[in-house]
Every structure is written in structure tokens, then in C-alpha cells.
């Protein structure tokens, strides 16, 4: 039993040391999105327009590929947006598939900034608001994309 506790503690400490616990990076984004631009890009060309919640030109990246019609547990989806007339990201929205989570296993977070020199700040918006909209894409595992 003591060995099990020691192993669990070591794994927890390793998780925190590696940043997997979601610590904010220097730009204000959580560490779990580090290197998202090297992940698989879901859309072939940038997505223009969209809802007021996610206006601008967007790109969507996934950390893991779909298995059949669903993304596996541990998948992270990152959507970035650049506002019209600007050349810097103003929005980074995330979806993380977590075992046992509601809404198909997805958790949502959104980060914004109003200038290229600012750090991103997390929006305090209820996750249920994201889920209500993403429910429209339930047949695509809650992920909106246009290829």
C-alpha cells in the first residue's frame, strides 16, 4: 500500500513538473496547448466569419486524430482567431476530452487579448454556454469545422 501511495505521489509531482496540470505559460495560455500549431490542422484553409462568439479568421488544430467518429480521451482541440485587419491572434479557444466529463466528455476554455503585446486572459464564461452551442455539432463529436 505504501509503495502504491509513493508511486501515485511521484506521478502527480511529475505531472505538475511537466506542466500537464495546466499552468499558465508566459503568454497567459495554459501549458496543455504548447506546440498546438504543430498538431494536425483540421481545416484546409482558414475559416472566415462565424458566430459573434468566435468572429474573425480561424484555424482549428487537434492533438489526436479521430477514431471513427470520435476523438479519444486526452484529445485537445485548439481554435485560434485573428480579428479583421489584425495580424495577431486575439482568441484561443480550447476543448479537452476528459474521461467522465459531461457533454460528450468535453471541457471548454477560452482565452482572449485586445493587443499583440498583452498576455491572454481566460474568459469567465460558464462552460455550459459553450456546451449549449457545441451541442449543435454533436454528430461531429461536438467539434465545428469547415473543411
Language-model regions: role of each:
Residues 22-39, 43-50, 68-147:
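Sequence context surrounding c-type heme c attachment/ligation sites in exported
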Residues 1-4:
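Positively charged n-region of N-terminal signal peptides that target proteins for export
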Residues 47-59:
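Interfacial loop at the N-terminal end of multi-pass membrane proteins
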Residues 6-15:
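Bacterial N-terminal signal peptides
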